[in-house]
From Swiss-Prot:
Keywords assigned: Golgi apparatus, Membrane, Phosphoprotein, Protein transport, Transport
Phosphoserine, modified sites: S839
Keyword field contains Protein transport: yes
Record's subcellular location: Golgi apparatus membrane
Organism of this sequence: Drosophila melanogaster
Membrane topology, as annotated: Peripheral membrane protein
Comp. bias intervals (Basic and acidic residues): 834-846
Bias (Polar residues) ranges: 848-857
Positions in coiled-coil regions: none
UniProt-recorded name of the protein: Conserved oligomeric Golgi complex subunit 1
Length: 886
């Protein structure tokens, strides 16, 4: 049966069963309930027999006590009746009637007074709601709280007389209390809302704290905890900005700082020592404090004579609390820890909305204007850490500095990202103009005025010589404008007076580190593209190198302006070192791009394919240029008759070599129409000479070269020509040793006596050929300083100030206004030399002249020629007019 009842669906019982079935179910349920009761009684009776006996005993005692009390009441009634009967014979009838009349009159007056007092109290209850609302609207919270406590006191007294006949006829008293009861929550909510305000005065704070002490009868530590929690809520509310009331970020940050400072100041003025709150509590607890009825309107105060004394003289009672500095310090320390967590979570989010330095400067200026309170005394009294209460220095200044850094980093990253994207677009679009367009004359190539010529703006003609087209110049202009904004915003912060000197130095260093980091990342991204096409490589390296040359504000990020050096002291040299380092890094990375182009050009024009690998008679006839025939006249010491001999020496390099160099120049000009930087040219020449030396090494080991002195002499001439044209010096030790080793190898294939005769003339022909072909070699020709400076002349990728522009007027030591002095000397028969040209090969010539009899007359002639040449040079030099030197 029980199982059936448990499975019974109560929801469908009256829908699926008839009345008789429902009645049967009801009986079964009652039967089960009775059985359970019996089982419970049996179970309780067996296990808790003593408890049942105690309960029965208590019930019996209650009955006995009730009977005893009833008997006592009967005894009292009998005694009172007996007393009246005993005194009845001694009283006269007249006196009894007078007393009865007085008693009745007194009872009637008492009832009337009770009636008027009750009506006056009800009148007060009806007037209190409006009065409480008035005080709440005027932010007089303690007055509203005192009136609410007064109304509760009145209502409590009326409820105690609720069984009287009068109160039974006046239910309005109970209803009026139902109206006044919600004021407890209303007043408390208004107090809590007031304590959450941003601007909170001392008087209002004391009013609210006193109201909380009176309203909930709380102790002062609980009220202090509530006050600090509400100030935390006020701090969070300051940081919010709703859609209905949007607030500026600066206002929100300053308001939050004001809340923190004002909270500590209120604790100092209101709760520490004999402060305003404790003096107010003593006034309320003193006997001179007026009763609460005095807060009523004048019409209600006129009814005070009708009120009972307990109502008319009512006033709130206070026990003046005590709050030690240790308790206040402990509560304040807990609140500070909480505020640190809130500031880390919410204040940083608000600072993240600051987008420019001007807002930060306004925040710092406003914080300085509002003043920073000095809480040193309070920290000492409450045993807090030093500067623990300096919220601006501990919480806001670090966030300000962090935000300044983030603005610099984000601005730099945005500018660098935009520049990188524009470079990618230029690379994808390819060359916007034909290569030869760079050298076409345009109207805006030269400045149209002296002011334009003297300005710091990049000159268009100079930029075109470096391959910088309009798109590149525009890209650099945009990037430089972004950097100018960053420098200007940072300058605003540095000019701000409240910023510490160490913070200013830190910001300057951070700007330099950020610039270096962003440029390094840009180069890494550009290198990660793994460009292989020549136009793409040229666009990438041109735009990257242009950033250094056409963006003056980029240098300011490393080398500080003069206005910043008052804070950096000796770190200006360090900034120059960082600038040189980043320039070197850019040049190094761009040099790798240049080398890819150079290797590609050399791979497309391999000397092994362009030059003949074997020199036979056909190659000699087609490749060797016409040699020059010279007649030498020699005279012995004993014979006056001279001996003439004819020699043939090369006058220019092989035609295939000239053709190869010409084709290489054309290929290079088609790829790179602008001038090559010295370092790139040096790398190109080194690679080219390396390949040519490998080719000539193969020719030097060929049997045809070993068998033919003419072939060896022509190859020797070619190597001397390459050494002279490409200015291979001892500083380039590897190439220098390699080319001289091959020259010595080819020299071994030539007859020593013949080579002694050829050496001086070969040197002269090499110089003449180099001078004649130097213009044709064009871009392959190194700079004039290359022979003397070697690799040091190409230590930088930066172009000369004015490449490919004639020096019309200059006072520099390297620029000549006049050509070299002419040297007048008689030409010896068959000798083509100059006075200033001395080669290492001349020494063995002179030695041979002294040892070989056939060369004696020639040696004397040379010495005579040298002496006459010196005299002629000196005469021509000192014979000039002094007007030439002016």
């Amino acid at each position: 049966m029980t199982a059936n009842l448990l499975n019974l669906n109560v929801d469908t019982l009256f829908e699926q069963h008839s009345v008789s079935e429902i009645d049967e179910v009801h009986k079964k349920i009652q039967s089960v309930v009775e059985n359970k009761r019996e089982e419970l009684r049996t179970h309780v009776g067996e296990r808790y027999r003593d408890l049942l006996q105690a309960a029965d005993t208590i019930a019996a005692m209650q009955t006995s006590a009730g009977t005893l009390m009833e008997q006592v009441r009967h005894v009292q009634a009998n005694c009172r009746s007996l007393n009246e009967q005993q005194l009845l014979g001694f009283q006269s009838t007249a006196n009894a009637s007078a007393k009865d009349a007085a008693l009745k009159e007194r009872n009637a007056g008492k009832k009337l007074q009770t009636y008027y007092g009750t009506m006056a109290q009800i009148k007060l209850l009806t007037a209190l709601p409006e009065l409480i609302w008035t005080h709440l609207d005027n932010d007089r919270f303690y007055a509203a709280t005192e009136l609410f406590i007064f109304s509760r006191h009145i209502s409590t007294g009326l409820q105690l007389d609720g069984q009287s006949a009068l109160m039974q006829k006046l239910p309005v008293a109970r209803k009026q209390w139902e109206i006044l009861r919600p004021f407890h929550v209303t007043i408390k909510q208004a107090i809590l809302t007031a304590l959450e305000r941003e601007e909170l005065l001392q008087e209002m704070t004391v009013d609210c704290l006193q109201s909380l002490l009176l309203l909930d009868k709380s102790d002062l530590s609980t009220v202090l905890k509530s006050f600090l929690n509400l100030r935390s809520s006020a701090f969070l509310n300051c940081l919010q900005s709703g859609p209905s009331e949007p607030r500026r970020v600066k206002d929100r940050i300053l308001a939050s700082l004001n809340v923190l400072n004002s909270t500590v100041e209120l604790l100092d003025k209101c709760l520490l020592g004999y402060s305003l709150l404790f003096s107010r509590l003593e006034e309320c607890a003193s006997s001179t404090c007026p009763p609460s009825i005095n807060r009523m309107e004048s019409s209600e105060r006129q009814l005070v004579h009708l009120l009972p004394e307990i109502i008319a003289g009512f006033k709130p009672q206070f026990d003046v609390p005590q709050l030690t500095p240790e308790q206040l310090g402990s509560s304040l320390q807990q609140w500070l820890d909480k505020m640190n967590a809130l500031a880390a979570a919410h204040l940083q989010q608000v600072f993240a909305l600051v987008t420019n330095m001007q807002t930060i400067q306004d925040i710092k200026s406003a914080a300085r204007t509002n003043g920073r309170p000095d809480f040193v005394r309070l920290e000492q009294q409450l045993h807090l850490k030093r500067s623990q209460l300096d919220f601006y220095a501990r919480k806001y200044v670090p966030l300000i500095n962090a935000r300044v850094r983030e603005i610099i980093r984000s601005s730099w990253a945005s500018a660098m990202k935009l520049t990188y994207e524009q470079v990618l677009l230029l690379i994808e679009a390819g060359q916007s103009q034909p290569p030869l367009q760079i050298w076409r004359e345009q109207s805006d190539d030269l400045p149209l005025s002296l002011a334009a010529a003297l300005s710091d703006q990049p000159k268009r003609l100079a930029n075109r010589t470096k391959g910088y087209d309009g798109a590149t110049i525009e890209l650099c202009k945009r990037f430089d404008s972004h950097l100018a904004d960053i420098v200007q915003e940072l300058n605003v912060m540095l000019q701000e007076q409240t910023t510490r000197a160490e913070d200013k130095v830190s910001l300057i260093e951070f700007l330099r580190e950020t610039a270096e980091e962003q440029l390094t990342e840009y180069l890494s991204n550009l290198k990660g593209l793994e460009l292989r096409e020549r136009p793409a490589l040229l666009l990438a390296l041109r735009n990257s190198l242009a950033l250094v040359e056409l963006c003056p504000n980029l240098k300011l990020c490393f080398c500080q302006p003069s206005s910043w050096r008052q804070w950096t002291d000796n770190s200006a040299g360090l900034g120059i070192e960082h600038w040189q380092r980043i320039c070197g890094l850019i040049e190094k990375e761009m040099l790798s791009f240049w080398l890819v182009i150079v290797d590609d050009v050399l791979a497309g024009h391999n000397c092994e394919e362009k030059l003949p690998k074997v020199i036979n008679h056909e190659v000699v006839l087609s490749d060797f240029a016409l040699w020059q025939t010279l007649t030498l006249e020699q005279r012995d010491e004993d014979q006056e008759q001279s001996v003439q001999s004819t020699i043939r020496i090369p006058s220019q390099p092989r035609l295939s070599l000239q053709t190869y160099l010409h084709q290489l120049i054309q290929a290079l000009n088609s790829v790179v129409p602008q001038t090559l930087p010295p370092k790139v040219l040096q790398a190109f020449i080194q690679r080219l000479i390396g390949k040519l030396l490998c080719h000539y090494e193969g020719l030097a080991h060929a049997e045809c070269t070993k068998a033919s002195q003419n072939i060896a002499l022509q190859l020797y001439f070619d190597l001397k020509f390459l050494e002279r044209v490409f200015a291979i010096s001892r500083e380039e030790r590897t190439l220098y040793d390699q080319i001289h080793a091959q020259q010595n190898q080819l020299r071994d294939y030539i007859d020593p006596f013949d080579f002694e005769l050829f050496a001086e003339h070969i040197t002269a022909h090499v110089s003449r050929a180099a001078s004649r072909l130097q213009g044709e070699l064009g871009v392959l020709t190194p700079s004039a300083a290359a022979p003397s400076q070697g690799a040091a002349a190409a230590s930088s990728l930066a172009h000369e100030a004015d490449p490919n522009v004639l020096c019309l007027s200059s006072s520099g030591s390297t620029s000549l206004w006049f050509p070299l002095l002419p040297i007048v000397m008689p030409q010896a028969a068959g000798r083509v030399t100059s006075a200033e040209r001395k080669s290492p090969i001349q020494e063995p010539v002179e030695k041979t002249a002294t040892t070989t009899p056939t060369r004696k007359s020639g040696g004397n002639g040379a010495r005579k020629g040298d002496s006459s040449k010196s005299k002629s040079s000196a005469a021509s030099f000192f014979g000039m007019s002094q007007e030439w030197f002016r």
